[in-house]
Structures are given as structure tokens and as C-alpha cells.
Amino acid sequence: NSDIESIVAKMARIPEKSVSSTEKDSLKTLDRNLKMVVFGQDHAIDELTSVIRLSRAGLGNEQKPVGSFLFAGPTGVGKTEVTQQLAKSLGVELLRYDMSEYMEKHAVSRLIGAPPGYVGYEQGGLLTDAVIKHPHSVVLLDEIEKAHEDVYNILLQVMDHGTLTDNNGR
């Protein structure tokens, strides 16, 4: 039974928990599980898990991401840990990008791929390829404030429309 669930999940490129009945149980205890490993962020965890539950209950827009969250605060308060534990609890990949590496205007092509006529055009971008491979994932854009404004514009498209087309039209 679990082998079948695993195979179906891989074929459909969805989390294994989505195929089994354990997703409902996992969502019920998501806030409690996160609070057991991340301390002092109860309000943020409550808001985060509330949005995820609403979306997974079918009350969100299926064309958009489950949620887009901005965790701000000083070093060491649990921003990165929340995303790591969330991915683990949901049974999905964590895609982490250090956005301080994307300070220059041309760096956006590293995320979505080079435009036609440029070196590396045949290859996709780091972000777009990863999301194609793992469409159900938690994406962590660490130190986003350091990224170039063109990166923000790309991310606004993702948050607003729920889509991003790479250089290969995928």
C-alpha cells in the first residue's frame, strides 16, 4: 500500500502525504509540531499554518502558490528554521537560495535562465529547474533584501499570478 502511494506520488510529482490519508493528520498537528522545534514564534506559526490549512482545504486559488510569506527579524529568531521544519513536516523539498548572490542585474538569469542568444540559453535557471523538478516545495529566499530589484519583479509575478516562465518557455 505504501509502495503504491510512493509510486503514485513520484509519477504525479506530488508529496507522498498528499496521496495518503496522513496529510490531513499532518495538517491538524502542523502548528504544534512547528512550535515544538521553533520557540518564541507562536503567532507567526499560527498565521502560517492557518493559511496552509485554508489552501489545502480548497479555499485558496489553485493557480497561485499555497502562500507567500515574508519572515523578517534579526539573526537567530527562527526564520530559516521555520521554513526547514515546514518542508520537513509537509514532506516536501526545501529549495534554498542565498539571495546575496543575486545583487547584480544580470543575476536574474541565473534564477530563470539566460535569454535567447546568450551563453547558457539551452539550460534553464536554478529556480525554474528546481521548481519544475519539485513543484510542491518550500522555497526559501534567504537575505532577499540583498537581491537586485529585477529579482523582486520576477518574484512579484510569481506571487501575483502563480506562474513563472523560464527561458525555454516552460
Per-segment meaning from a language model:
Residues 1-170:
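AAA+ P-loop NTPase nucleotide-binding core of proteostasis motors
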